[in-house]
């Protein structure tokens, strides 16, 4: 599975969420990995969130989070942004 991170343009679309994502980078951990998806844990301000990457889903649904923002808005959240930034910045290694 080749994990595809989001474009910088998409990550920076909402400046407030992007800044929060930067702040959360160090709280990102890999939970588990299968052949078709990867589960990440992100410690948010108040609770632990699960971010999932689904290889087999369409591009706009590959990244999902269990937080209220993502669930209600169906838009990128700071937790998904944090995972993407951690991968892009080399703070999180995904074995291919």
PLM segments and residue spans:
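Long, low-complexity, compositionally biased intrinsically disordered regions
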Residues: 1-96
